[in-house]
Regions:
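Short functional micro-motifs and their immediate structural scaffolds
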Residues: 21, 25-28, 196-199, 273
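Radical SAM/AdoMet-radical enzyme domain recognition
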Residues: 8, 37-60, 68-181
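Flexible, acidic/Gly-rich N-terminal and inter-domain linker regions that tether
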Residues: 1-7, 18-22, 216-231, 296-297, ...
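A short, flexible beta-alpha/helix-coil linker loop
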Residues: 27-31, 119-121, 185-186, 297-300
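Flexible mid-to-C-terminal extensions adjoining Fe-S/redox cofactors in radical SAM and related proteins
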Residues: 258-332
Length: 332
């Protein structure tokens, strides 16, 4: 058994100021009918238990996490759970400026990851609200000037592929690191003007999916060195490689390389369409503990109304799945 996972995602809210075509209605929260925001008092109870069970790195996501009215207090709460706690913030930059002083104060323990998918707001008939606007450029410059670890997350599809190389160059010039993610083909998307589900969603995802073969070759030729495995805080899920440009790097999350799966995944009815494997536990809106991206309801643990003892047992059930994982490919 390896070192137990110490990383958990927290989907604070399903609310978002944008509607990106590759996202789903509830964001990273797993339940398609549970919408809204975690109650702060209930969340604090669960986070305390999570920390006591060995989870010390908290990835805050949504929806858009900076929209919750207790965001400032949440940062302080997590930072005071213990001296070893860390926050990884997934955001589109909305309201982020309000919290820069606090983030700077804890900058040795907080990473900021801004979603930026294109140079222009409209690309090849697709709306990209998370583009490299002047506001985002200025925000990135301020984060770097304050010494805050900053990364752009870029979801690559056929729609924005023509802009990716220039976007990488501009990102490096700004001083931020980059993570490239291929599209996860799944059974639900907000879609390009129309929501798509089930078979229609799978077809939509396959149509706009862009492989990384040519892009990785380009990065290898442009970078000073490469690394086959490069992890910042969590080595589970899809293996990630890196390409270095001086002190900066471009990390590539490429699902064609397979993913780490638990033994419980072997007989799962969703395994043929699951490309993420077991990446991390996640707290979803609706007070649900599950595995990020997992569609199997056998591994959804409803925390609402449960005792502390029951919640601890659920965490242990989830965490045990990460004790024995194996790299496999489910793609054919």
């Amino acid at each position: 058994m390896g070192k137990r996972v110490n990383y958990i995602a927290v989907a604070l809210t399903t609310n978002c100021n944008y509607n990106c075509f590759y996202c789903k209605e509830t964001g990273e929260s797993i339940n398609s009918v549970s919408k809204g925001t975690w109650d702060f008092e209930e969340l604090k109870k669960v986070l305390k238990i999570a920390y006591e069970e060995g989870l010390s790195t908290f990835r805050l996501t949504g929806g858009e996490p900076t929209m919750v009215n207790y965001f400032q207090e949440l940062i302080e709460y997590i930072m005071h759970l213990g001296k070893d706690t860390k926050i990884r913030l997934n955001t589109n930059g909305y309201k982020l400026k309000k919290f820069l002083d606090t983030i700077e104060f804890y900058k040795n323990r907080i990473d900021v990851m801004i979603s930026v998918d294109s140079l222009n707001e409209y690309v090849n008939g697709f709306h990209y609200p998370k583009y490299l606007s002047r506001n985002i450029e200025e925000l990135a410059k301020e984060l770097i000037a304050r010494g805050i670890s900053t990364r752009f997350n870029i979801v690559v599809t056929k729609a924005n592929y023509s802009e990716i190389k220039e976007l990488i160059k501009k990102s490096i010039d700004l001083g931020v690191n980059v993570k490239l993610l291929d599209l996860i083909v799944r059974n639900e998307y907000l879609g390009n003007n129309t929501k798509v589900h089930d078979l229609d969603a799978l077809t939509f995802g396959e149509l706009i999916y862009q492989d990384f073969k040519e892009l990785k070759s380009y990065l290898a030729s442009e970078s000073s060195r490469t690394q086959d495995r490069h992890y910042v805080s969590n080595g589970n899920g899809i293996p990630m490689s890196a390409y270095f440009f001086g002190n900066q790097w471009v990390q590539v999350k490429d699902s064609s390389r397979g993913a780490t799966y638990a033994k419980e995944c072997t007989n799962c009815s969703y395994k043929s369409i699951c490309y993420e494997g077991v990446f991390s536990p996640i707290l979803s809106v609706g007070e649900i503990l599950n595995i990020s991206g997992c569609m199997n309801k056998d591994f959804y643990y409803i925390l609402k109304g449960k005792t502390e003892t029951e919640i601890r047992s659920y965490f242990n059930e989830i965490l045990k799945m990460f004790d024995h994982t194996e790299l496999k490919s489910m793609k054919h």
